[in-house]
Amino acid sequence: MVFLHQTPSSSLMYEKLISLLPQYTSIAIDTPGFGMSDDIPGNPTIEDYGNYILEVLDNLEIEEFHLIGHHSGASIALYIENHYSKMIASLTLIGVFLATTEEKNLMKKQTGLDWSPKEDGSHLMNVWKLAGDILGAGEDLNLRQRETLDAIRAEVSAKQMHDAIWNFNEIEALRKTKAPSLILCSEDDVMYPFLNQAIECRSDAIVETIQGKNLEPDLDATNIAVLLMEFLKKI
């Protein structure tokens, strides 16, 4: 199993879920610019991120795998499936961004949370709010601290990734997918309003509502593990 994390998190977001899937060899990769991966310059695209992930898998000599992606990780997963479908045994997308170009342009104008360094330290409260209120860590201080630290580390990289996301067509990419697919999303996930597109794009996909706001793999890990195992038994 290969796991691709959301922005601005890191592969740490999958530790709980992976612990519930001991029967599988699981690999969670830090996307370039996140976690412990090196930064990359310029204006990388989703295609670039996908190719970096494939380079890692090639170095590990992994030729076939179940692919799981969350938010931006789901976008990268779609690119990988579209271009290297023979490698993908199954595709699981959590909170995939199935917005139209018009919807993305509107969201782009409304997305304004900034945690670039400020002399007065106010950016630290901004990122604390991001982790707790927006992502959904809430009163779980350990989770909130982890997500805060991941976000601070990825402050520049998050902007790169968001720019890449605005310019990638997840709807068209999902339509092109061939692998057996499981699509999950929490009702309070920021991507939930677009979930109806999943059925229109892939009527044969299994679509399930889960819990956990934007941190489902942490906050609804047991349920996701059950759904994932049931899904894999069917394919």
Where are these regions (language model features)?
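Conserved HGGG/HGGXW glycine-rich cap/lid loop of the alpha/beta-hydrolase fold
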Residues: 1-38
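Residue in the alpha/beta-hydrolase core beta-strand immediately N-terminal to the catalytic nucleophile
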Residues: 30, 66, 89-92
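Conserved acidic catalytic loop of the alpha/beta-hydrolase fold
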Residues: 47-65
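Gly/Ala-rich beta-loop-alpha elbow adjacent to hydrolase catalytic centers
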Residues: 69-77
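Conserved alpha/beta-hydrolase catalytic His-Asp/Glu region
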Residues: 102-103, 118-175
